[in-house]
Amino acid sequence: MFDAKSFIEESVEDIKKQINGRKTIIALSGGVDSSVAAVLTGKAIGDQLLAVYVDTGLMRKNESNEIWNIFKEQMGLNLKIVEAKDLFLSELAGIDDPEQKRKIIGRIFIEVFEKVAKEQGEEILVQGTIAPDWIESEGQIKTHHNIALPSGMVLEVVEPLRDLYKDEVRKLATELGLPEKIAHRQPFPGPGLAVRILGEITEEKLEICKEANFIVSEEIEKTGLQKELWQYFAAVLDTKATGVKGDIRDYNWVVALRFVKSLDAMTAHTPEIPFDLIKRISKRITSEIPNVTRVVLDVTDKPPATIEFE
């Protein structure tokens, strides 16, 4: 049985020893993993910690504002937001291979942190890596952005959660007093919406993905189903389909819906979702996002599929 209180006590001491008085940056995404890592590190080293949130442009709708309100205004963390959308999108232009996209995001992600670290005199980078991240990477299922570190990286990495699974991290979040919204937030991939946009990432597909995911989250959370689901999201497929808008033929993008249940992300299954809810989500997406003509439902378990599309 996982003892959250004991883990916190031991981790705080371990982090103190690892960091040993050095100035430290944490990669804060607002997900439960990085949030718990931030609080643990803060308990260990206090004001030596600088929480850095990189706005890659690949995040959820309104994410930067929510991060600021929760972590700066409510929790009082020493928080710096780095606007890097243009940098990420320019580097990703023309790239359609999923592994290339992940590696580019990982490289830029670390480079941005290194730049801030040099400016602030930081030496340590804390990451919220958990067990499924490195297990999948070692098994070559997919590369996770927060462990595909470039050679010659200047910062030393500390990963206080690397042996834990998501359910254990959520228990830690509750024990640490994190807001319910963070403690039980659905997992969000490190590379952001990049793994929910198949093929090349364009501004058009990115905006579709943001709006579609916002609609899915809003509708699921209205019903309370988020408490039963591991993840619920939309992906933009790299294909178009014929539709009709008004009396006019339209040839535009296809959005896929995905709902899964899981305990630790190593396996997952597709539950039955009320069909009227699926229809409502589909209708909202096709009516509120002009350049989407079709919505489909992915019912594939993991394995054989992974949870995210890329």
Curated annotation (Swiss-Prot):
<comment type="function">
    <text>Catalyzes the synthesis of GMP from XMP.</text>
</comment>
<feature type="domain" description="GMPS ATP-PPase">
    <location>
        <begin position="2"/>
        <end position="185"/>
    </location>
</feature>
<dbReference type="InterPro" id="IPR025777">
    <property type="entry name" value="GMPS_ATP_PPase_dom"/>
</dbReference>
<feature type="binding site">
    <location>
        <begin position="29"/>
        <end position="35"/>
    </location>
    <ligand>
        <name>ATP</name>
    </ligand>
</feature>
<dbReference type="Pfam" id="PF02540">
    <property type="entry name" value="NAD_synthase"/>
</dbReference>
<comment type="pathway">
    <text>Purine metabolism; GMP biosynthesis; GMP from XMP (L-Gln route): step 1/1.</text>
</comment>
<dbReference type="InterPro" id="IPR001674">
    <property type="entry name" value="GMP_synth_C"/>
</dbReference>
<protein>
    <recommendedName>
        <fullName>GMP synthase [glutamine-hydrolyzing] subunit B</fullName>
        <ecNumber>6.3.5.2</ecNumber>
    </recommendedName>
</protein>
<dbReference type="InterPro" id="IPR022310">
    <property type="entry name" value="NAD/GMP_synthase"/>
</dbReference>
<dbReference type="Pfam" id="PF00958">
    <property type="entry name" value="GMP_synt_C"/>
</dbReference>
<comment type="subunit">
    <text>Heterodimer composed of a glutamine amidotransferase subunit (A) and a GMP-binding subunit (B).</text>
</comment>
<dbReference type="InterPro" id="IPR014729">
    <property type="entry name" value="Rossmann-like_a/b/a_fold"/>
</dbReference>
<dbReference type="GO" id="GO:0005524">
    <property type="term" value="F:ATP binding"/>
</dbReference>
<keyword id="KW-0067">ATP-binding</keyword>
<dbReference type="GO" id="GO:0005829">
    <property type="term" value="C:cytosol"/>
</dbReference>
<dbReference type="GO" id="GO:0003921">
    <property type="term" value="F:GMP synthase activity"/>
</dbReference>
<keyword id="KW-0658">Purine biosynthesis</keyword>
<keyword id="KW-0547">Nucleotide-binding</keyword>
<keyword id="KW-0332">GMP biosynthesis</keyword>
<dbReference type="InterPro" id="IPR026598">
    <property type="entry name" value="GMP_synthase_B"/>
</dbReference>
<keyword id="KW-0436">Ligase</keyword>
